């Protein structure tokens, strides 16, 4: 017969609630990455155009960025987010559609900032493509 031992009770993991967050939208020419973080920068949810089912040249469309932003927004809803600051980085085609999609999900967008890195004549850029 088994001895009745001391069983350690497993604690239920409690989801933290965050009211204000930051949506980082990285829109490159090939893909769009949407990450939603809290104010300290801890990631709550993220989604990409490629991970949303788009492949090849369809990954770099505004619609793919919209779907990625909707998926990240819905995943971050379970943390109780209400307000978002949006930081947009990069020259890609999904910049504006991702911001609109986050607005349509139901977040109150308080601030939109462009944080695209601009070199002060730093590294030499890659050579131009000859097609």
UniProtKB/Swiss-Prot annotation:
A molecular function GO annotation: structural constituent of ribosome
Domain of life of the native organism: Bacteria
Protein name, UniProt field: Small ribosomal subunit protein uS11
InterPro entries, alphabetized: Ribosomal_uS11, Ribosomal_uS11_bac-type, Ribosomal_uS11_CS, Ribosomal_uS11_sf
GO terms under biological process: translation
Keywords: Ribonucleoprotein, Ribosomal protein, RNA-binding, rRNA-binding
Function description: Located on the platform of the 30S subunit, it bridges several disparate RNA helices of the 16S rRNA. Forms part of the Shine-Dalgarno cleft in the 70S ribosome.
Record bears the keyword Lipoprotein: no
Entry similarity comment: Belongs to the universal ribosomal protein uS11 family.
A Pfam family reported for this protein in Swiss-Prot or TrEMBL: Ribosomal_S11
GO cellular component annotations of the record: ribonucleoprotein complex; ribosome
Assembly behavior: Part of the 30S ribosomal subunit. Interacts with proteins S7 and S18. Binds to IF-3.
């Amino acid at each position: 017969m088994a001895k009745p031992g001391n069983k350690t009770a497993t604690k239920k993991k409690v989801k933290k609630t965050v009211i204000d967050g930051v949506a980082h939208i990285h829109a490159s020419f090939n893909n769009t990455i949407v990450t939603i973080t809290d104010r300290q920068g801890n990631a709550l949810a993220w989604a990409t155009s490629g991970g949303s089912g788009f492949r090849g040249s369809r990954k770099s469309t505004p619609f793919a960025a919209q779907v990625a932003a909707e998926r990240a927004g819905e995943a971050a809803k379970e943390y109780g987010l209400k307000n978002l600051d949006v930081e947009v980085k990069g020259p890609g085609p999904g910049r504006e559609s991702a911001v609109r999609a986050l607005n349509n999900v139901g977040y109150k967008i308080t601030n939109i900032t462009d944080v695209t890195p601009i070199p002060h004549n730093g590294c030499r850029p890659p050579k131009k493509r000859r097609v």
